Amino acid sequence: MSKQTAVVLGATGLCGEHLLKSAVASQAFEKVYSISRRSLPYVADCEQIVDKDSSSWASLLPKENFKFLFTSLATTRAAAGGFDKQYQIDHDLNLELAKASKANGCETIVLVSSTGANKNSWMPYLRMKGEIEEDIIALNFKHTIILRPSALLGDRRDHHKGFGNDLFVKIGNCFYRSRLQSIMGYPVQGEEVGIAGVQAALQEAEKNTESPTVRYVGSSEILELVDNFKNNS
């Protein structure tokens, strides 16, 4: 496969940061773009597009023919100011940018979702995640990869803190890569989500298929992809 161009959304968050770092570090990509509300000081070798007005992001997508879109674009209910506003970012903005990317010739999309995502869930968050997955799949990208991490571990630059989150992370760290990790649904590091997302995208892009493909990657497979990548590096 010749060297490609990729776009990363949500790089100010934990998973997005590591998707961007993994894409930049990969020899598969000649150029990597990020679109965000603020600049990203932790990575230099990418084309940063910064605009606080996310409603203009679709028009800011690269005009060149990019084949890969990685998105972990998301917020919290508290940060957004309510669930309806969270939905506008997590669902509506993701869908708008995915549609625009496909119109620009993008073939492979990697979406960071969540374990338990289900459009029929009684929990608003998991129902929203399930609706995002369904609507992204309906766009019929050549390859759709949906990452469903469980407990997310790692340092967050967005200060997504609080007693509940801190406690969950502490418990997740206790089970991380232990014999009992399945009890917590296989906790993963944000870095591992980034590595797995890029590796899964490259694997799918190598497949010569005529019909659109959809691949779900849960936490246990995320760990397997990371181990295989490190063993072969």
UniProtKB/Swiss-Prot annotation:
Keywords of this entry: Membrane, Mitochondrion, Mitochondrion outer membrane, Transit peptide
GO biological process: import into nucleus
Compartments reported by the entry: Mitochondrion outer membrane
Cited InterPro entries: Him1/Fmp52, NAD(P)-bd_dom_sf
Segments forming a coiled coil: none
Membrane topology: Peripheral membrane protein
Protein family (similarity comment): Belongs to the FMP52 family.
UniProt protein name: Protein FMP52, mitochondrial
